[in-house]
Amino acid sequence: MKSYLKALVFAVLFLFILGFVYPTVTSLITEHALPFQSEGQPVEIDGHIYGSYLLAEAFNSSFFFHPRPSAIDYNLSESGSYDYSLGNPAMLNLTEKYLHRFLSENPGVNISEIPYAMISYSGSGLDPGIPLQGAIIQIPRISIAIHNITNLSVSDLYSYLYNLVNSTKTQNFPFFGSYYVNVVRLNVDIVEFLLKGGYISQSQI
């Protein structure tokens, strides 16, 4: 009887420690040490929350950097993708569809310049990261689009965007990894640039 009681006490104790104390303590430490990360890295512009730097959205405007294709149309409630193999005809058809869409959105880009990630969906369907090259080849289209609403020099806009992209690049693995950029972060910088210049209003975001 005593052994059963001892086992029950230990079970309740461990349940309390591992189910309540440990999660609570780690949560409090994280909230104070890394408040931005612990809150999901929210996108805040002029006091309003518009999303998260961790989640891609369907940035359809021509003056935005476009993310990777999404099998779920960037639906936050349905994270995931198709389970097609690379040789599956359906996968090949989707890749061809994404390729034609990218080329139509970015005239002048050569097929050989397009990273495969830009014409294939991510595993979650919400990945905000794209290859550095995938961002750079979008700059001409974005420069012209911003010029059309600001009348600023296309060459100056290209330089601004090129520097912006390269200043935010990160490696997916230290030292030897490929360079990626976060499209949400880039697009937030564009929005803030346009807001600051008075080219768009808060209601247009």
From Swiss-Prot:
Cellular localization per UniProt: Cell membrane
Topology in membrane: Single-pass membrane protein
Source species, domain of life: Archaea
Sorted UniProt keywords: ATP-binding, Cell membrane, Ion transport, Membrane, Nucleotide-binding, Potassium, Potassium transport, Transmembrane, Transmembrane helix, Transport
Record-linked Pfam families: KdpC (PF02669)
The keyword Aminoacyl-tRNA synthetase is assigned to this record: no
Function: Part of the high-affinity ATP-driven potassium transport (or Kdp) system, which catalyzes the hydrolysis of ATP coupled with the electrogenic transport of potassium into the cytoplasm. This subunit acts as a catalytic chaperone that increases the ATP-binding affinity of the ATP-hydrolyzing subunit KdpB by the formation of a transient KdpB/KdpC/ATP ternary complex.
Family, similarity comment: Belongs to the KdpC family.
Self-association and partners: The system is composed of three essential subunits: KdpA, KdpB and KdpC.
Protein name: Potassium-transporting ATPase KdpC subunit
UniProt gene name: kdpC
